[in-house]
Amino acid sequence: MQKSISFFVIFSILWGSLFLFSIIGSLGTTPIPLTKDSKFLMSSILPQGWGFFSKNPRDTAIGLYEAENASAKVRWPNMRADNLFGLYRYGRSQGVEMGVIYSQVGKEQWTACKEKDLGACKSKAKTVQLKTPAPRPLLCGSYYLTKEDIVPWSYSKYTPSSYQVKSIVKVVISCSKT
């Protein structure tokens, strides 16, 4: 019993120290300075650091809406019940396919939208014909692809949606299912 408690304490101290030094090593100037050698050692042990957690929350989001109605076509987030809480890959596949379609739309094809209503933006959108390169396409037909700004949480009670459409394009996606 004493042996397992000692092992647990030593193991906890080692992992806790590694975690603490990885955080301190990724910070700038701190009250607990590390030498250059210590920072180099930490970056060689944990090379990726903590940067993968730092996505800008104000980045532009991409939206995809059916041409016939205002509902979002894609089945996100992935952890919803109709995606079997992440087990069903349909939503993830749509995201990849939508990214490929988004990359095919040129900058000059987007129409700026200052209206708050998605319907008003739809009436101004340019139409673009695209062909999906996906071997088993999920997105075929007419959709509206949007660039949207996320409304900050502090303003969310003043807007009907958590996103504000900044630009829009109508894409007609032709598919050759094999």
Swiss-Prot record:
InterPro entries: Sporulation_SdpA
Chief location category: membrane
Keyword match Transmembrane helix: yes
TM annotation in the entry: 7-29
Topology in the lipid bilayer: Single-pass membrane protein
Intracellular or extracellular location(s): Membrane
Cellular component terms per the entry's GO annotation: membrane
Keywords: Membrane, Transmembrane, Transmembrane helix
Name under which the protein is recorded: Uncharacterized protein YitP
Originating species: Bacillus subtilis (strain 168)
Organism lineage: Bacteria, Bacillati, Bacillota, Bacilli, Bacillales
Gene (UniProt): yitP
